[in-house]
Regions:
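Cytoplasmic membrane-interface segments at the C-terminal ends of transmembrane helices
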Residues: 1-10, 31-32, 146
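Intrinsically disordered low-complexity regions specifically enriched for long asparagine
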Residues: 1-2, 13, 17, 87, ...
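Hydrophobic membrane-insertion alpha-helices, especially the h-region
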Residues: 9-26
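Hydrophobic alpha-helical transmembrane segments in integral membrane proteins
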Residues: 23-42
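Short, surface-exposed interaction patches in beta-rich subdomains
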Residues: 37-57, 61-150
Length: 150
């Protein structure tokens, strides 16, 4: 019986070691920063003064709703990042979008342009009097950028 518990201990320790190694590899490959936050975060931006330069989340869902914001003439810059999880950005009508959206592993849908799998990305080349220059990155998960319907 003593031999059984010894082998059981070895098996459990081995499985635990494999789990720790797998988590370490995952964190390294997908560049996960839990210090950026874990959970769901939602932002409803109504003015240029209320818009941050960047929105970042470690693990979870990040929603940035710009549908009520009056964009100034020219270019407005926005950098968004979720290490593991989902990123959702809502853009008002009448605002062009340029920039880049990428998911290291996952799905990207930006205003109907889609890509998925490893290194999914969509380039944005919109022009106009009001432009959002968007950088959207997800390590593992999905990006969805859509236009608000008014």
């Amino acid at each position: 019986m003593r031999g059984f518990f010894r082998w059981l201990g070895i098996v459990v320790a081995s499985l635990l070691a494999l789990f720790v190694i797998a988590v370490g590899v995952f964190v390294a490959v997908f560049d996960v920063h839990p210090g950026r936050g874990i959970g769901d975060q939602s932002y409803i931006v109504t003015s240029r003064d209320g818009l941050r330069d960047e929105y970042r989340l470690g693990i979870g869902s990040l929603d940035v709703d710009l549908s009520r914001m009056q964009f100034p003439l020219g270019v407005t810059y926005l950098d968004t990042r979720v290490d593991v999880g989902d990123l959702h950005v809502v853009i008002p009508p009448g605002v062009a979008v340029r920039g880049y959206a990428e998911a290291r592993a996952g799905h990207v849908n930006v205003l109907g342009k889609e890509d998925d799998n490893w290194n999914a990305d969509v380039d944005l080349t919109g022009t106009g009097p009001r432009v959002l220059d968007l950088t959207a990155h997800v390590g593992a998960g999905s990006i969805r950028v859509e236009r608000a319907v008014r």
